[in-house]
Curated annotation (Swiss-Prot):
Keywords: NAD, Nucleotide-binding, Oxidoreductase. The active site is at Y167. Pfam families: adh_short_C2. It is an enzyme of class 1 (oxidoreductase). The lineage of its organism: Eukaryota, Viridiplantae, Streptophyta, Embryophyta, Tracheophyta. This is Secoisolariciresinol dehydrogenase. It comes from Podophyllum peltatum (American mandrake). GO terms for molecular function: nucleotide binding; secoisolariciresinol dehydrogenase activity. Its EC number is 1.1.1.331. The keyword Oxidoreductase applies. Substrate binds at S104, S164. One of its GO terms (biological process) is protein homotetramerization. Oxidoreductase involved in lignan biosynthesis. Catalyzes the stereospecific conversion of (-)-secoisolariciresinol to (-)-matairesinol via a lactol intermediate.
Amino acid sequence: MGSTSTPDSSTNRLQDKVAIITGGAGGIGETTAKLFVRYGAKVVIADIADDHGQKVCNNIGSPDVISFVHCDVTKDEDVRNLVDTTIAKHGKLDIMFGNVGVLSTTPYSILEAGNEDFKRVMDINVYGAFLVAKHAARVMIPAKKGSIVFTASISSFTAGEGVSHVYTATKHAVLGLTTSLCTELGEYGIRVNCVSPYIVASPLLTDVFGVDSSRVEELAHQAANLKGTLLRAEDVADAVAYLAGDESKYVSGLNLVIDGGYTRTNPAFPTALKHGLA
C-alpha cells in the first residue's frame, strides 16, 4: 500500500464499486473519497456539514461519480435514507466506510469528565457505527457480498494518559463490533474490518485542540516510533482502499494498525531507564 501520491498501476482497482463514506466532508473521509473515485468507484459521501460535503463533491468529480447526502449517523432514519438513496442512484452498495468519529471536549480526569459529553461521544462513535453497519448489512445480505470498514484508532486496543476515557472506550467498542459483525456476516460473503491509525493531523484534532496541522505533526513525530516520515490521511485512505477492494477478498475481522510500530514499543521504559542511569 503505497502513498496515493505515487503512481499506481492498479488505477481501476475499485472499478464499478459503489461506496458510502460517512464523515466524508473532511479529513480521512474526504481523502478516501478522492482515492476511491480515482480508483473507479462511485461514491456517496455523508456528513452533517452540508456545505463542506457539497464542496468536496464539486472538487472531486461530476454528480454521477460522487454525490452528497446529509446524514446524522445517530439517527436511524438518516442512515436508512443514506443507504436507500445510494441504492436508488447506483443500484447497489459494495462498500460501507464508517468513518464518523468525535473526541471528548471535557477534561481527561474521570472526576471532571462530563456526563453528557460521555453520552454524546458514545452515541456518535458507537451507536453511529452500529447503525451504519445495520443498514449496510440490510442491502448487502441479499446481494451475498460487501465490505464494511470502520475507522477505529490505536486507542481501540491501548490507552494513554490524556486520551479521554470515553474515546478509548468507544474505539475499543468499534473493534469489538468489527469482530462480532465479521462473525455473523461472513456467512453472507460480507467482510468486516477496521483501520487503527496513529495520530493524523486531521480537523478532528486541530479543531478540538486549537492548533494547526504542522504542530500536530511535530508532536506526533516526537512521540513516534518510526522516524523520518509522517502518517497522513492519504496513508489511511490507502489502507481503507485495500480492505474495501478485491485485493483483500479473504480478509475479514482484521484490525489494520497503521502506527509505524508505535504500539509495539514501550516508550516509558527507555525514558525511565535513561533517567535512572543519568
